[in-house]
Amino acid sequence: MKGYHLRLFWILLLLGITIPRAAYAQGSMAAAQPHLDKAKAAAWRPADGLNDLTHLYEVVCAPALSPKGPGEPPDQAPPPLSERKVPPRADWYQEPAKVFDNLYWLGSWGTASRIPPNPGGDSTWAVTTSEGIILIDSGYDYSAPVLIGEGLKKLGLDPAQIKYVVLSHAHGDRYFGSRYIQDAYHAHIIMSEKDWDVLAKSDEPNEIKPKKDMIATDGMKLTLGDTTLTLYLTPGHTPGTISTLVPLKDGNQRHVGAVWGGINPSLVRYRVKYFANWEETFKSWSASTVRFQEIAAKAGADTYLTIHPFYDNALEKIHLLQYRKSGDPHPFVSKDNLNRFLTIIKECTDAQLARITAQPQSTKLNQ
């Protein structure tokens, strides 16, 4: 009998642990489901591949859909430059492209285009003005001389005319190339104060960190010649993520582009903790999304431009521009797509928040 009671004790103990966890998982998924449904509805356009945002939904909502719930891989220090494996040019190179009369794409594509490798590549946007060029992000140190320096020349532009680089946030895929641009072309580097602080604390290689320069503030107007960009602080991906409104020209038509400065919310990267906990992270990112959506609507924004080309189907749209005839709609222009994009970001974030704040359901075993 003693052995039986011992076995029963361990069975009840195990049940006492596992059943509340199962109840928590079920309860938290139930709390998240309305947000997941809204995100999926915003993404799903099966009959229109160009405007279908299912891939965005699958990536951004993945943590909320996971049985383990929200979280991210253990933080790891980046390798020193001497140990880093730079992918061959053929694995990331893409031809530069003109997207609007005053906007150019200078990005990468491919599984090995990022360090660590990540499918889809990175976007750098070049805004031309009457007095020079403004870049939004810079890609990697190994790719910037090719994609930006050589790319602008291929488009008939002079990289020496780069006057400013707006860095959306302090992650390597945004800023590693900026030190090259700062040194080669004497361009000003702009980032939020909080992300300059992140950069200073980060374990990423100091050799490719830009020298601290201009500080972006919320609502800041960046004017160069005949063009003014407006920068907004939208924390959540990093403490000081920047999202940008860009005036666009398409013949006689005028549009407003919205560059959302991140994708997934982040808590820590390269030994730098961004927020106190996940709840604060999710609340910050969700609030930023709502605010920027309102700002974009008030500004008449009708074009969404992302920092990774697979989230806005940039290459497919660029391909269509080759066949566009006078009077045809511009494939990048769509207020609906902009709103759907931001809705997916918000609802996937809210789904993660719902999962971590849901209360465990009571069971007889843990009463």
Where are these regions (language model features)?
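Divalent metal-coordination and catalytic microenvironments
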Residues: 102, 127, 137, 169, ...
